[in-house]
């Protein structure tokens, strides 16, 4: 479940492919604009925030399509996305990623940081994990958090944005199946 191939499939399936049709397209990013607006507003819908999120997500889709829609059919398949990650991210640090990836990572952090304190603590990590997978025991999630975080992270109250960015970069660019970043999104399942 922690192979690089599965991790990239996981990102496509659970982070971007919001409409669950097996590929990325403009509709996924329109849906992400609504989702992000509601998450940021904690259920309240702000037309101004939505307009801003729509602009961000449209720009993000356009950039991802430019980087990954190799056959220019308006859809980015899992294989195309993997090729784009290999070309633009593999072996690179977060600071070297294309803007589209950076924007998405920052937005993902904002969505997980439910209380807005600038850190992702264990409680927020748990909430994020249960949105994508089913767990019979919370210990599975807590064990993954312990593998992900360092003592310094835990003393600080959780993952800062900078630390999250670094871990996300490792998650999609580091082929090592035992790196701590493999647990960024909790215990992973094999993506079919």
Curated annotation (Swiss-Prot):
- InterPro entries associated with the record: EF-hand-dom_pair (IPR011992), EF_Hand_1_Ca_BS (IPR018247), EF_hand_dom (IPR002048)
UniProt keyword list: Acetylation, Calcium, Metal-binding, Muscle protein, Repeat
Disulfide linkages recorded for this protein, renumbered to the chain, are none
Q: Does the keyword Nucleotidyltransferase apply?
A: no
- What positions does the entry give for Ca(2+) 2 binding? 69, 71, 73, 75, 80
Q: Name one Pfam family in it.
A: EF-hand_5
Q: What name goes with this protein?
A: Sarcoplasmic calcium-binding protein, alpha-B and -A chains
- Origin species: Penaeus sp. (Penoeid shrimp)
